[in-house]
């Protein structure tokens, strides 16, 4: 092709859904797969839970395999649904960043439903926070392989030229006190 080709590109919002599967495996057993932890994950997750409860869900398989993580707040909100009041979900701590605890508020709607969490070597960050909170609070059973080990809290810092750099300021720790970050 000779010459210049001009194109008009129209930007559109593309909805990104983080719950990419939710169904009954057999009577009484629901299955939900979370692909990542985004801004609407909790809302999507609870919609899926309510539909499965209406179909008679008594147990839940939560699939976090290949889930690379996402927003801390989304992970905390999901974990809260399974835990009792004041149960530790995760805490962060760094050399120059004081410890910050994230605890369950006791208003979770899945506190009495047995849960089985599927994880693998690509389950990272927020997925490790949820699975770690469920495991350390004896709230469910983890099934699978050792997770990725991404437990860094990173903050963006703007540089004078307008660019940004993300620096590690703290680490994530599951309730047992174990750091998620792989050495």
What are the roles of these predicted feature ranges?
Residues 1-160:
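Cleft-lining beta-strand/loop regions that shape enzyme active-site pockets
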Residues 2-3, 164, 179:
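Short, solvent-exposed loop/turn motifs
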Residues 124, 172-174:
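Short Gly/Pro-enriched loop/turn and capping motifs at secondary-structure junctions
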Residues 156, 171-172:
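Residue-level detector of beta-strand face positions
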Residues 161-170:
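Short acidic, Pro/Gly- and aromatic-enriched capping/linker segments at domain boundaries
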Residues 175-183:
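Conserved functional hotspot residues or short segments at active or partner-binding sites
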């Amino acid at each position: 092709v000779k010459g210049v080709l001009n194109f008009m590109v129209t930007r559109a919002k593309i909805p990104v859904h983080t719950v990419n599967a939710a169904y009954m495996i057999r009577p009484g057993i629901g299955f939900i797969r979370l692909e990542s932890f985004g801004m609407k994950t909790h809302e999507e997750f609870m919609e899926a839970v309510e539909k499965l409860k209406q179909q008679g869900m008594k147990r839940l398989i939560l699939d976090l395999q290949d889930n690379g993580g996402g927003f801390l707040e989304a992970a905390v909100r999901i974990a809260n649904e399974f835990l009792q009041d004041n149960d530790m979900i995760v805490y962060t701590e760094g050399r120059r960043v004081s410890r910050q605890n994230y605890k369950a508020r006791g208003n979770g709607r899945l506190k009495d439903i047995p849960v089985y969490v599927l994880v693998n070597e690509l389950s990272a960050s927020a997925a490790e926070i949820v699975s770690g909170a469920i495991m350390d609070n004896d709230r469910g059973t983890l099934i699978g392989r050792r997770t990725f080990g991404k437990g860094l809290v990173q903050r963006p810092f703007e540089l004078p030229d307008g660019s940004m750099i993300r620096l590690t300021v703290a680490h994530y720790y599951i309730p047992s006190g174990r750091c998620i970050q792989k050495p």
